[in-house]
Amino acid sequence: MKARAEKIADGLYWTGVLDWDIRNYHGYTLQGTTYNAYLVFGDEGVALIDNSYPGTFQELMARMEDAFNREGREMRVDFIVQNHVERDHSGVLVELHRRFPEAEIHCTEVAVEGLLKHYPALEGTEFRTVKTGDSIDLGGRTLTFLEAPLLHWPDSMFTFLDTGILFSNDAFGQHLCYPQRLDTEIPEYILMDAAKKFYANLITPLSKLVLRKFDEVKELGLLDKIGMIAPSHGQIWTEPMKIIEAYTAWATGKVKKKVTVIYDTMHHSTAMMAHAIAEGAMSEGADVRVYYLHEDDRSEIVKDILDSHAIALGAPAIYDEPYPSVGDLLMYLRGLKFNRTGQRRAMVFGSMGGRGGATGTMQKLLADAGFDVMEADEIYYVPNNEELDACFEAGRRLAGDLNE
């Protein structure tokens, strides 16, 4: 096959893979993504930074061949940099090793075990393990490594090219699939929304590590040298401070006067309550988002929770327990640990036909997830006007608390 590499800067090409078709990746909904790989040409050596998902070797190689042809160079890779073990960035490493057997594979020490577990065919391969500050000289260009454990796997690392380009792997990524490669080539609201969704679903529990890593980068004197951030998914940041400032805001829990209302319903009673709560919150001037779990996806929901000061979560009771879709969301929220970016208020609500008690379970699970749970509003069967008025007032109180 034929495919074109995208020249990003002198001696630097994007040689990744466009996945137009993917719609779900480990529970995260998306409209396609990219698996970004980069070829760096020095006077004496060539490095490939990261690779792509299993089954995409031909597309990756076609772009690499185009880059070598345009540079007028023999197709030879001297270094393979594996910033992260996960299969969407290492999935064709075995094929690359067979194609370029002399290429040194550079990764963290923790990554070696993970790569061998994922790819037993690499058993016996000599890996070059690196630590923060280690570097490789390509001839006129130097790649320096920066360990980044748990951003977002224990094996993760960043690679810095001395011309000012940070290859950050998953950090600063977005699940977008556009033929354009740069941040400035697509609408900013689409770019930032995708980056926010990526952070909310993948980086939120690691927020304290994000801030510590920023401090480390400053101490190493690299922050002012970063002129471009090239992540492993989505667009390349040519204005890197834009995403660094956004990550700082998200990691420190900067929120808006905003209430996210989330519910599921069987016979529309809980839906009536949800809409009344939303109206109450809006009456206090809050920005409000309403999600219906029967139709809406949790990865979109948590994107709005990220910058909300409060949430309202509603479910009908089934045998005195929350509706299953709400239980699923509660487990997801517990894993994301939103309290690590500051505590958010929460209320729970729902309708019941028996003894009730589902709201008590929801309160406990939300507290376990790090939310400051205020109150529960549970009604019997269909809410009457008086009960809907009470829901409206609950929404007002929830939004009013944002002014405290």
Swiss-Prot record:
Q: Which GO terms describe its molecular function?
A: electron transfer activity; FMN binding; metal ion binding; oxidoreductase activity
The protein's required cofactors: FMN; Fe cation
Q: Fetch the Gene3D superfamilies from UniProt.
A: 3.40.50.360, Ribonuclease Z/Hydroxyacylglutathione hydrolase-like (3.60.15.10)
Positions of the Flavodoxin-like domain: 259-399
Locate the residues binding Fe cation 1.
84, 86, 152, 170
Enzyme Commission number(s) of this protein:
1.5.3.22
UniProt: FMN binding residues? 265-270, 317-320, 351-356
Cofactor info, note text: Binds 1 FMN per subunit. Binds 2 iron ions per subunit.
Query: Could you tell me what reaction this enzyme catalyses?
Result: 2 reduced coenzyme F420-(gamma-L-Glu)(n) + O2 = 2 oxidized coenzyme F420-(gamma-L-Glu)(n) + 2 H2O + 2 H(+)
- Flavoprotein among keywords: yes
Q: What is this protein called?
A: Coenzyme F420H(2) oxidase
Highest taxon of source: Archaea
